[in-house]
Amino acid sequence: MSEEKSRNGPARLKLVLGGATLGVVALATVAFGMKYTDQRPFCTSCHIMNPVGVTHKLSGHANISCNDCHAPHNLLAKLPFKAIAGARDVYMNTLGHPGDLILAGMETKEVVNANCKACHTMTNVEVASMEAKKYCTDCHRNVQHMRMKPISTREVADE
């Protein structure tokens, strides 16, 4: 019996080491994929997103990734959120009709608002309008992607 155990020892060790190596490679691949798909070059790889990428690059938020605003920061919330949003984007850009104007859905608005508040904590303390308006983007509609309208035609501060 001990002779049989000693023969199985190296095989078991190889199996454990192989499994651990495979696990590390899988985690590294997921981490790289998550980081890569957070960045502007990936997000603007569909032609419909090119104008958004240009305005982001020129904005005050150019140094942060798209998903610093557009996805939850919590990894367990981020994974399904990105998977669903990615599948929807692939479908709309290949089989659907995305239209000229891209509007955020309610779930995305909630995520973006939470991320605004997370980064701009000191601003939230001083802003009285936080009680009057539900979302930061109710007043700061185009802060990330720059002003789109001449001053004379704006309805909110940063259109």
Swiss-Prot record:
Entry membrane topology: Single-pass type II membrane protein
Coiled coil: none
One Pfam short name: Cytochrom_NNT
Keywords, alphabetical: Cell inner membrane, Cell membrane, Electron transport, Heme, Iron, Membrane, Metal-binding, Signal-anchor, Stress response, Transmembrane, Transmembrane helix, Transport
GO molecular function: electron transfer activity; heme binding; metal ion binding
Membrane-crossing segments per the record: 15-33
Residues annotated as binding heme 2: C66, C69, H70, H145
Binding site for heme 4: C136, C139, H140
Residues reported in the UniProt entry to bind a menaquinol: N67, K82, D89
Induction / repression: Expression is induced by NrfR in response to nitrite stress. Not induced by nitrate or nitric oxide (NO) stress.
GO biological process, one term: anaerobic respiration
Spans annotated as Interaction with NrfA: 99-100, 123-158
Protein location: Cell inner membrane
Cofactor note (record): Binds 4 heme groups per subunit.
Cytoplasmic side: 2-14
Topological domains annotated Periplasmic: 34-159
UniProt binding sites for heme 3: H61, C116, C119, H120
GO-annotated cellular components: plasma membrane
Binding site for heme 1: C43, C46, M49, D89
Family membership: Belongs to the NapC/NirT/NrfH family.
Protein task: Electron donor subunit of the cytochrome c nitrite reductase holocomplex NrfHA. Acquires electrons from the menaquinone pool and mediates their transfer to the catalytic subunit NrfA in an anaerobic respiratory process of nitrite. The other biological function of the NrfHA holocomplex is to detoxify nitrite. This function is essential for the survival of this organism as it enables it to overcome inhibition by nitrite, which is produced by other organisms living in the same environment.
Binding partners and assembly: Component of the NrfHA cytochrome c nitrite reductase complex composed of 4 NrfA catalytic subunits and 2 NrfH quinone-binding subunits. Interacts with NrfA homodimer.
Designated name of the protein: Cytochrome c nitrite reductase subunit NrfH
Naturally occurring in which organism (per UniProt): Nitratidesulfovibrio vulgaris (strain ATCC 29579 / DSM 644 / CCUG 34227 / NCIMB 8303 / VKM B-1760 / Hildenborough)
Lineage: Bacteria, Pseudomonadati, Thermodesulfobacteriota, Desulfovibrionia, Desulfovibrionales
